[in-house]
Design a protein with these regions (language model features):
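Glycine-rich beta-strand-to-loop/alpha-helix junction loops that act as flexible
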Residues: 103-108, 126-128
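Active-site-adjacent beta->alpha loops and helix N-cap segments on the catalytic face
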Residues: 1-5, 22-38, 52-57, 76-91, ...
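Glycine-enriched alpha-helix->loop->beta-strand junction motifs that scaffold or abut catalytic
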Residues: 10-17, 36-43, 61-69, 119-124
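Short beta-strand/loop segments at the ligand-binding rim of alpha/beta enzyme cores
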Residues: 36-46, 94-105
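Surface-exposed amphipathic alpha-helices with a cationic face
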Residues: 11, 33-37, 87-98, 145-152
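Active-site beta->alpha loop and helix N-cap motifs at the rims of alpha/beta catalytic domains
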Residues: 1-23, 150
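Catalytic cores of alpha/beta
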Residues: 51-62, 97, 108-124
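Catalytic beta/alpha-barrel core
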Residues: 14-28, 42-51, 70
Length: 152
């Protein structure tokens, strides 16, 4: 299918940003950035607690859209809360004064984790919890969204 055809299809569908988790930043810069920009498509880069400051600043300088702050190296899904170490990570990134907005993802499932994430970021990404609610309400997105909003 190819990356350019993918970007073209995204643009035709109204998609303006994608996450390609296993795409190394250097490969993006060298092989994909020009094509993505041609279709006004943002490639969202992920950072983790293990990503060093130099790499974070490099990502911030060469991308737009937002930076996806992965809350942990664990798999996505519900967490009861964010411990002090994760809070310190969120604060450290906030204090870097990046030009891109920062969104926290992985483990956002309730008001407590949502509020904790938003206290040091521009917002939170809720994936697994939303999929769980879609399954619960048999694909009724409106019911799932209503329930999710009540939870938060």
């Amino acid at each position: 299918f190819g990356f350019e055809a993918f970007c073209r299809k995204c643009a035709e569908c109204g998609i303006d940003g994608v996450i390609i988790p296993d795409l190394p930043f250097r490969d993006y810069e060298k092989n994909y950035k020009t094509i993505a920009l041609k279709y006004d498509l943002r490639v969202i880069m992920l950072i983790t607690p293990e990503t060093d400051e130099k790499r974070i600043r490099e990502i911030d300088a060469h991308t737009d859209g937002f930076i996806y702050m992965v809350s942990s190296a664990a798999t996505t899904g519900a967490q009861k809360d964010f411990d002090n170490r994760k809070q310190a990570y969120f604060k450290k990134i906030q204090d870097m004064n990046l030009h891109n907005p920062r969104m926290v993802g992985f483990g956002i499932s309730n008001k407590q984790t949502f509020d904790a994430a938003c206290s040091h970021a521009s917002g939170a990404i809720i994936g697994s919890r939303f999929v769980t609610l879609l399954n619960k309400y048999k694909g009724d997105a409106q019911q799932a969204i209503t329930h999710l909003k009540e939870d938060l």
